[in-house]
Design a protein with these regions (language model features):
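Extended, compositionally biased flexible segments
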Residues: 1-18, 22-41
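Short beta-strand/strand-turn micro-motif
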Residues: 4-8, 95-99, 112, 177-250, ...
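Short cationic amphipathic helices and targeting signals
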Residues: 8-13, 17-25, 55-59, 103-114, ...
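Glycine-centered loop/turn motifs
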Residues: 28, 79-87, 208-214, 251
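Short, conserved charged micro-motifs
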Residues: 29-30, 65-67, 117-123, 208-210, ...
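Glycine-rich, acidic
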Residues: 38-39, 44-189, 193, 201
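Conserved small/polar residues in nucleotide/adenosyl-binding loops
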Residues: 260-266
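Hydrophobic alpha-helical segments, chiefly the membrane-spanning helices
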Residues: 270-271
């Protein structure tokens, strides 16, 4: 175990001996195989996939909590249902696991529903949000919002080639505790970072950055763009990139080279 980032997932304790593990669609098989490999041999823990039986609805925005309260008897007040909490109850007539988490950077809830009750849950959500002008949003919108917030995307900004400290996740790692890959990670910490994940403010108002584009400093390639999107609320052309530690200082001037061979000057700030 090399000490690098292995997966990205949401884990929730359901308080009845079950742990909910929600990962990216693209990593389902990878994560299932890795988890199965590390199950205790005595069979005391079982691993079940809910991919084919459940679907997730995302309710996000400043009115999300009020809309959620309209369609459930669960107490959705901030005091009873705070950030990073999970509750089980009904959405309309549909049984649901509801998590107070967000990938958009706004107040948001994940509503996990069994597929045979999905339509009922969706109708309850639409009815509860109608008076507030609630509408659908797509992946490009959430990509823009999560980049403004500084949230990282699996297999884009979070990849198995780099460790948590290089990926900006060091504050979540407790090196004084034992875990799989700890020895390898400690060796990499001692050796120093190979690359560092940084955020870029691209000084161009007509062309976005491109994931995979090279990042240069003084004519030398120093890194690669991992994600890019226009931040509509902050009015900035945003990107994330892994760059050499020497080029990872706030205010460093770098250049992102797009696939169309345009050069996009950047003014960098750490995310």
């Amino acid at each position: 175990h090399h000490g690098n980032v292995k997966a990205e997932a949401t884990l929730a304790n359901l308080d009845d001996g079950r742990v909910w593990y929600g990962s990216a669609v693209a990593s389902e098989i990878h994560d299932m195989e890795w988890l199965a490999e590390h199950l205790p041999a005595d069979g005391s823990i079982r691993l079940n996939s809910l991919t084919n039986t459940h679907t997730t609805l995302i309710l996000a925005g400043p009115k999300a909590r009020a809309i959620l309260q309209k369609m459930t008897r669960i107490n959705c007040s901030p005091e009873a249902f705070g950030w990073l909490q999970v509750l089980q109850g009904f959405v309309g007539i549909a049984p649901a696991v509801i998590m107070s988490v967000s990938f958009s950077g706004e107040q948001a809830f994940e509503i996990h529903l069994p597929n045979n009750q999905l339509h009922a849950g969706y109708l309850a959500l639409c009815q509860a949000g109608e008076a507030s002008g609630m509408g659908l949003f797509g992946s490009m919108a959430i990509e823009s919002m999560r980049m403004e917030k500084g949230y990282l995307h699996w297999k884009a900004d979070l990849i198995t080639e780099f460790n948590p400290f290089e990926s900006g996740l060091g504050r979540f790692v407790q090196m004084d505790k034992d875990f799989i890959g700890r020895t390898a990670l400690q060796q990499m910490i001692t050796a120093g970072p190979r690359k560092l994940l940084v955020s870029l403010d691209i000084a161009c108002d007509h062309a976005p950055g491109h994931p995979g584009a090279s990042v240069c400093a003084d004519g030398d390639v120093v890194g690669t763009v991992t994600s890019a999107a226009w931040g509509h609320r902050v009015g900035k052309n945003l990107a994330y990139a892994f760059v050499d530690p020497a080029a990872a200082h706030i205010g460093d001037e770098l250049t992102a080279v797009s696939y169309t061979h345009l050069t996009l000057p950047t003014s960098r700030s750490v995310g």
